[in-house]
Swiss-Prot record:
Domain of life: Bacteria
This protein's record includes keyword rRNA-binding: yes
GO molecular function: rRNA binding; structural constituent of ribosome; tRNA binding
Classification via Gene3D superfamilies: 3.30.1440.10
Functional summary from the UniProt entry: This is one of the proteins that bind and probably mediate the attachment of the 5S RNA into the large ribosomal subunit, where it forms part of the central protuberance. In the 70S ribosome it contacts protein S13 of the 30S subunit (bridge B1b), connecting the 2 subunits; this bridge is implicated in subunit movement. Contacts the P site tRNA; the 5S rRNA and some of its associated proteins might help stabilize positioning of ribosome-bound tRNAs.
Pfam families reported in the protein's UniProt record: Ribosomal_L5, Ribosomal_L5_C
InterPro entries: Ribosomal_uL5, Ribosomal_uL5_bac-type, Ribosomal_uL5_C, Ribosomal_uL5_CS, Ribosomal_uL5_dom_sf, Ribosomal_uL5_N
Subunit structure, as described in the record: Part of the 50S ribosomal subunit; part of the 5S rRNA/L5/L18/L25 subcomplex. Contacts the 5S rRNA and the P site tRNA. Forms a bridge to the 30S subunit in the 70S ribosome.
Gene Ontology CC terms, in alphabetical order: ribonucleoprotein complex; ribosome
Stretches assigned to coiled coil: none
Stated name of the protein: Large ribosomal subunit protein uL5
């Protein structure tokens, strides 16, 4: 269990909820959108044929998230990618609760400012149902990973799942939490 102090959760409860209630005219606090979970997905490419590389990426993702990843397997064979059904093709972690809030804080305040040539998150990456997706091209922006200990640069996809009904609600939720969006 994570017992770390969660500044972002406190900010959500004390600052973001009242702002969202005022902006969207919610009458009940349960109508306010909240973040349900964060899903981090990492495709491993040639790691499907190299068990050592798979284990290194598994340890990296575990260090980044604080939770052991699940190995995802191919659902069907694709000859062009040299993938057979059942081969390991990726790693996935679903974060909820305190780990989710810690990861959100780390993404917004530590990781995104370290991304090279970062000009803000794309505000058009919402899925129409209030969920936000973005990708990172390398894992070295996380403080837990150093370039000399990692064998290969590996990107990842991050999906923030919210209870928001519209993209506008989700956008304001993430913006009030401190996510830097492009203008």
């Amino acid at each position: 269990m994570v017992t770390q102090y969660i500044p972002l959760k406190e900010k959500y409860e004390k600052e973001v909820v009242p702002k969202l209630m005022k902006e969207f005219n919610y009458r009940n606090i349960n109508q306010v959108p909240r973040i349900e979970k964060i899903v981090i997905n990492m495709g491993i490419g040639e790691g499907s044929r190299n068990a050592d590389l798979l284990n290194k990426h598994l340890k990296e993702l575990a260090a980044i998230t604080g939770q052991k990843p699940v190995i995802t397997k191919a659902k069907k064979s694709i000859s062009n990618f040299k993938i057979r059904k059942g081969m390991n093709v990726g790693l996935k972690v679903t974060l909820r609760g305190l780990r989710m809030w810690n990861f959100l804080y780390k993404i917004a305040n530590i990781v995104l400012p370290k991304v090279r040539d970062f000009r803000g998150l794309n505000p058009n990456s919402f899925d129409g149902h209030g969920n936000y997706s973005f990708g990172l091209t390398e894992q070295f922006v996380f403080p837990e990973i150093t370039p000399d200990q990692s064998p290969k640069t590996q990107g990842m996809d991050i999906v923030i799942v919210t209870t928001a009904k519209t993209d506008a609600e989700a956008f304001k939720l993430l913006e009030f939490l401190g996510f830097p969006f492009k203008r």
